[in-house]
Amino acid sequence: MITFKPTRDADLVEAVGNHPDIIAGSNNGDGYDYKPDTKYFEVHVHGEFGGIVYYHETQPLTFDCHAMYLPHARGFSKDIGLAFWRHIIATTNFACVISYAARKFRHGQIYCAMIGLNRVGTIKKYFKGVDDVTFYSATREELIDFLQKHSRS
């Protein structure tokens, strides 16, 4: 069972975001700072804390979504991502979600596609004038359709 618990615990969010395994896959390697205007959720998988998922409303009804999974929870990443889509579909009125992954972070790119996001394109030298970043998005309707096609019976 996967559950999401809203959190405003900045220390917890930063501890996860600055975990060496999280930083290794981050876009710029600088670590993570808590952002007060972001909605954070603790992820629990079968009762065990597995990381943080979050979104920030970049435009009205557009959520920039990201995940920070601890190593022991990564085997559940697809299930967590799909459950998070179900959660925000049920609890918000978003119209579109976006995300991005550094070109060097192939796992992040694969993950975005695996949970139903569509590749939009790549912006060269997006991070610090060095790293290229690939952007992904999906509308609410596209995610609902994806979830219907990829639900377990």
Spell out what each predicted region is:
Residues 100, 118-134:
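Conserved catalytic-core motifs of GNAT/GCN5-like acyltransferases
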Residues 60-72, 100:
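Conserved acetyl-CoA binding element of GNAT-fold acetyltransferases
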